[in-house]
Amino acid sequence: MALTPLAIHDLTEAVLGCVCVALDTTAATVDGQPGCPSCRTCVVPGAVAWDSCDDPCSDTATGGQLTVSVARLYASSDVDFPAESSSVQGVRGCLPPPMTALELVVTLLRCAPTFTEHGCPPSCEELSAASRVLHVDMVTVYNALLCCLPGTEQRRRGRRFVMGAQRTIGPQGGCVGLEQRVTVALPGCAPCPDRESP
C-alpha cells in the first residue's frame, strides 16, 4: 500500500500545532518564559533558514522562529523500524509491505544575548536568563512530541515513533535555539496508482 498524498504534510502541520500549543502552555505556567513565536511558526521545505529569531510582528507578539521540516523519507519494516530497509521490492513472494519512515526536524530559535553597542560581551545574568529559556524550551519540545505523536494516528496503539537526538544550535547571528529530530512511521493506506505493466 502507498502513502496518501497529504500523509507527510498533514503530519508536519500536526507536529507544528502540537509544539506551538505546548510552548504557549509552558509560557502560562513558567514566569518569564516566551510562548510560541507569533510571526514565524511554519512548516518549511528543506533546510531551515534562520530568517528571524527576535523580531515580533507587534508589541504584544512573541519573537522567535518555530519550524518543522522533513530531513528524509525512507523504507523500513515493522520488525526493524526505524532502521532503513534493504529488502528488494517488486520480487515475487510473500514479503510484508514495507513501512515508510519519515525523519522530521523541529527547530526553535530565540534571541541570544550579544555584544553591546560599546563592544562589551553579554553579562552572566543575560546569559543565564537565555540559558533558562533554552532549557525550558528543550524540555517543552521533547515532552510535546512524546505526548502528541501517539495521537496523530487513528490506530488502536497510536503512531510508532523514535525520538532522535536533540541538540542546541547557535548562538549565531543573534539567535540560539534547539533542533529536535524524530523518526515517525507512516503506514501505507492508499492503493498504488493503476498502471499497466510494460
Residue positions per predicted region:
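Small/polar-rich, solvent-exposed N-terminal microdomains that initiate assembly or binding
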Residues: M1-G93, P198
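Residue-identity detector for threonine
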Residues: T4, T12, T25-T29, T41, ...
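Acidic-leaning, charged glycine-interspersed low-complexity segments
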Residues: V30-T41, E125-P187
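Short, solvent-exposed beta-strand/turn "edge" segments of beta-rich domains on protein surfaces
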Residues: A83, G90-P98, I169-G173
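Oligomerization/assembly interface segments of phage tail-like spikes and tubes
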Residues: P98-P113, G173-G188
